[in-house]
Amino acid sequence: MTATDVWTRLDERIRAYQQLRTRHSQALEQIALAELAEGVQQSNAIENSTLTLDDTEAVLAGRLPAGRKELREVFEAKNLAAVTADLLTGTEPLSTDLILRWHATLLAGIRDDAAGRFRRANEWVRVGGHLGANPGFVSGLLADALDRYRQDTTRADREAPRAVVDAIARFHCEFEVIHPFVDGNGRIGRVLINKQFHDLGLPPVIVRARNRDRDYYPPLARYATTDDHEGMTSLLALLLLESLHKRIALLTSARVIPLADWARAAEIRGNVAANKARRQTIPAFRMRHRWTIAEDYHEMTPPT
């Protein structure tokens, strides 16, 4: 699928989603809450948490995970879930104060000395070869990034998905390059992606830990050296398509089935179906890490 095809398909899916959203707001809230644990587990896994999805669900249900787990990982799951739940139910506009409050929640019981504040004085941070912004300028740089995001989305045609996804991608890259906190930058940054989608009436996305070295880290590294955020825009477009496909399928189809079962019935090789799913040329989506699709979906055969 070409870049043009992605945006055309995304525009079509957003329009379909918005029509469903007016009639199924409660169902969409439940879908978002049902995938909360998966989003939490994946975001923490990007930061090397060892908690599985089952572990995370146990923690969020008030139980201890199986086996020997670090207490920090338990706090990480509970705290990120609290921030995500606030995002899904809240209406407060995106601001520096909101970011700091969410950061305080995220690091509560983990790094109370650093929770809810920007880096200070000699609190420099490094991720691999990337050095975060000078701590003396962090507050101003983040304020500038927020101002630019507001300007980008104000100028953008809200009906044109490319402009708003591009603005969110640029902000995320800039946020991660600044690295405003001593700890928790990645998790808060990914929360902010979904806050921005939420404010635009769009569903949350899940950045997958398994694909971080292929899909997520390279666009951040490229932006840090070239100011080019196109790779992040492309990634967020595909993740948003997947999220829309999931919601449209759950609201309009009687059953969803594993992609492997659909591929067998459609006489398509499994690896071909999986590749189509990754490129979102079919309306497949992941539930509990497994590719899934509406049972009644029939792929259109191009004319010969």
Predicted regions and their residues:
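FIC/Doc superfamily catalytic core
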Residues: M1-D183, R187-T304
